Amino acid sequence: MIQIFFLGTGAGSPSKKRKLPAFLVRREGLNILLDCGEGTQYTLMNNKLGINSIKIIGITHMHGDHVFGLLGVIASMGLLDRKETLYILGPRDLKDFLYTSFEYSKFNPSFKIEFIDNYNDQNITIATFKTCHTVESQGYLISERDRVKIDEEKLEKEKIKDWRVMRKLKEGKTVEYNGKFLKPEDYLVIKRGLKVAYTGDTIPCQSVIESVKGADLLIHDSTFLNEPSAFTYGHSNVADAAKVALEASVKLLALTHISPRYEDVTEHLKVARRIFPKSILPDDLSYITLK
């Protein structure tokens, strides 16, 4: 199970309804923050989302609405006596930006900060992919590893209830049971891992489409409803995001990075759903659960 909290779904500058980009992804105790607009630490604390429980932060690019909240988050982690290593992914200039800011503000983190290009553990991987914005930018693909599970329905049909048999089958061993040899390949099924993709700011481009294929959730730049100059600014219109979702065969599309010029987003959803019916436009502080 993966939960995604939409902490900030706005763009450029905050509005009454939408804060700046930030998304918290949770999976069984692992907390990942994607982008960190100004005010993210307040949102985390005010909603008891555990600022010090964040293990990994991924920044898509160096525009202020995506990164100006990072210093505050890290400073608060220090004030809250963090001890665990914080892992950060991001553009090449991010490390210099942070440490120069630390130097000028006389802040010395009490915990280790490690800059990484990707992340792997026994349960998930985090990979980056190229996006198409006006500055160096990257998206993030969070992927659960596929898991082997016992076909409980088949065992029940065959009236096999011995947990020792189940354990050995899961270990890949052939088991003798009631005079019959049970082969693991006949009782094991592969549960495909979930995939969450986040583009940050981008125009629709092939590198994004190829990277997010089959994702269970695609969080895609949808800055404008129908702005002819959207591509000039490195952003997507709602229809562009929907077309990417359709071509990439994703399961669910979340429209985000909504320009503050829009108070009513009813038309955004109508446009997106004409192209890709499984589209949503989350409000700040909403969340979804993928299973």
UniProtKB/Swiss-Prot annotation:
Cofactor binding description: Binds 2 Zn(2+) ions.
Protein name per Swiss-Prot or TrEMBL: Ribonuclease Z
HAMAP family reported for this sequence: RNase_Z_BN (MF_01818)
Cofactor requirement: Zn(2+)
Residue numbers binding Zn(2+) 1: H61, H63, H133, D201
Subunit description: Homodimer.
The species this protein was found in: Saccharolobus islandicus (strain L.S.2.15 / Lassen #1) (Sulfolobus islandicus)
Protein keywords: Endonuclease, Hydrolase, Metal-binding, Nuclease, tRNA processing, Zinc
Pfam families: Lactamase_B (PF00753), Lactamase_B_2 (PF12706)
Binding positions (Zn(2+) 2): D65, H66, D201, H257
NCBIfam families with a match to the protein in the record: PRK00055.1-3, RNase_Z
Catalytic activity: Endonucleolytic cleavage of RNA, removing extra 3' nucleotides from tRNA precursor, generating 3' termini of tRNAs. A 3'-hydroxy group is left at the tRNA terminus and a 5'-phosphoryl group is left at the trailer molecule
Function, as annotated: Zinc phosphodiesterase, which displays some tRNA 3'-processing endonuclease activity. Probably involved in tRNA maturation, by removing a 3'-trailer from precursor tRNA.
InterPro entries named among the record's database cross-references: Metallo-B-lactamas, RibonucZ/Hydroxyglut_hydro, RNase_Z/BN
Family: Belongs to the RNase Z family.
EC numbers on record: 3.1.26.11
Active site (UniProt): D65
Superkingdom classification of source: Archaea
Entry's Gene Ontology molecular function annotations: 3'-tRNA processing endoribonuclease activity; zinc ion binding
